[in-house]
C-alpha cells in the first residue's frame, strides 16, 4: 500500500552493547510508522552484532566499522550509505522507544517546521521519572537541563516548545539539514555532540524543538558511568589515558567551549570570552 509518509532511517550506533540491546531493537521493530528502516552501525564491538540484530529485527541493515572514531563520525557514515531518506532518527544503543514515538516526532517536525526534534526522555527503569525534556545553554556554552534530577512526570513539561539542545539518545534530524551541516563534527568524539550539532543548526536558521508526546526510555550507560569510555577515543584526541585519565565532565566542557568558539560571532566572542575565562578560573 502506497503511503505519503516521509521515509525515516533509524541509525543505531552500537559499541559492544549489553543485554539491554535487544530491547532497543524490539522497540524499533514495534513502531507504528510504516516508512521506517533501521541501520545498525556496529562500531568496533568485541563481538559481531549481526546475529543479535537478526534475531530481533531481521529487516535491519548492519554495517561494521572496524575503528571507533566516536559517535558522530559513525553517524556521518549514513550520508554516504543512504539515499532517499527525509529524516534520520539518530539513536544510542541503550534507548527504548514507545510504539508511537517515530510517528509523533515526524508529525511534530512537519507541524512546527522543525529541523531537529527531541522526544521526552524518561528513565529506563522508571518511566515516570524525567531525564530530559530538551535542554538549554548558558552564555559560556554549558548545557543546562530543563528538569530537576529524578523529577516526576506529571505532565508539567508537555508543551511543544523551542529548545537550544536536543539531547543525545534519540533525535530526529531532517536529512537535508544534516547534509548541509556536514553531519556531526568528528572532533567531538564523545560528550557534547548534541550541543555542537544543534548550535550549528540554529546558526543556519533551523528550528530545534521538543515534542513531549513522543517518549523514549534511556539507560544512559556512558553518561551514568556504567560504561567506560573507549580508550581508542582518547587516543584519537591525543590524550594518554594512563597519564591523564580525562573525565566525561572534562570532555563535555572541552566540547562546549569548542562550540562557543565555532558558533559565536567575532564581536560576541570579544564580550563573552573574558567572562568564560573568569568562570573557568572559579571552577
Ranges and model annotations:
Residues 26-35:
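Short, acidic, metal-binding catalytic loop of nucleotide-sugar glycosyltransferases
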Residues 34, 42-50:
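A conserved acidic beta->alpha catalytic loop
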Residues 65-83, 93:
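Glycine-rich, basic loop-to-helix element that forms the pyrophosphate-binding segment
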Residues 88:
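Short aromatic/hydrophobic "clamp" motif used to bind/position activated sugar donors
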Residues 98-138, 142:
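Conserved donor NDP-sugar-binding/catalytic core segment of glycosyltransferases
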Residues 142, 150-173, 195-196, 240-244:
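A recurrent flexible, glycine/aromatic-enriched loop bordering the glycosyltransferase active site
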Residues 164-222:
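A short, conserved alpha-helix in the catalytic core of glycosyltransferases
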Residues 204-283:
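Active-site-adjacent helix/loop segment of glycosyltransferases
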Amino acid at each position: 500500500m502506497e503511503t505519503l509518509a516521509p521515509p525515516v532511517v533509524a541509525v543505531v550506533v552500537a559499541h559492544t552493547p549489553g543485554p539491554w540491546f535487544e530491547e532497543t531493537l524490539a522497540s524499533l521493530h514495534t513502531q507504528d510508522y510504516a516508512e521506517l528502516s533501521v541501520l545498525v552501525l556496529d562500531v568496533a564491538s568485541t563481538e559481531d552484532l549481526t546475529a543479535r540484530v537478526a534475531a530481533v529485527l531481521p529487516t535491519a541493515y548492519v554495517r561494521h566499522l572496524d575503528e571507533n572514531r566516536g559517535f558522530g563520525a559513525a553517524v556521518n557514515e549514513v550520508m554516504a550509505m543512504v539515499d532517499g531518506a527525509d529524516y534520520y532518527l539518530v539513536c544510542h544503543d541503550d534507548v527504548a522507544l514507545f510504539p508511537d514515538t517515530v510517528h509523533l516526532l515526524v508529525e511534530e517536525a512537519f507541524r512546527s517546521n522543525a529541523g531537529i526534534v527531541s522526544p521526552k526522555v524518561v528513565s529506563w527503569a522508571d518511566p515516570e521519572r524525567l531525564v530530559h525534556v530538551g535542554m538549554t545553554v548558558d552564555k559560556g556554552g554549558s548545557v543546562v537541563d530543563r528538569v530537576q534530577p529524578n523529577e516526576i512526570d506529571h505532565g508539567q513539561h508537555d508543551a511543544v516548545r523551542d529548545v537550544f539542545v536536543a539531547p543525545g539518545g534519540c533525535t530526529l534530524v531532517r536529512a537535508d539539514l544534516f547534509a548541509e551541516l556536514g553531519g556531526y563534527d568528528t572532533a567531538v568524539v564523545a560528550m557534547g555532540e548534541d550541543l555542537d550539532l544543534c548550535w550549528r543548526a540554529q546558526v543556519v536558521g533551523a528550528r530545534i524543538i521538543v515534542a513531549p508526546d513522543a517518549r523514549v526510555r534511556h539507560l544512559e550507560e556512558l553518561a551514568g558511568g556504567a560504561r567506560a569510555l573507549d580508550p581508542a577515543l582518547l587516543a584519537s584526541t591525543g590524550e594518554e589515558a594512563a597519564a591523564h585519565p580525562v573525565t566525561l565532565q572534562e570532555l563535555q566542557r572541552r566540547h562546549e567551549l569548542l562550540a562557543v568558539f565555532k558558533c559565536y560571532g567575532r564581536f560576541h566572542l570579544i564580550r563573552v570570552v573574558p567572562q568564560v575565562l573568569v568562570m573557568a578560573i572559579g571552577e
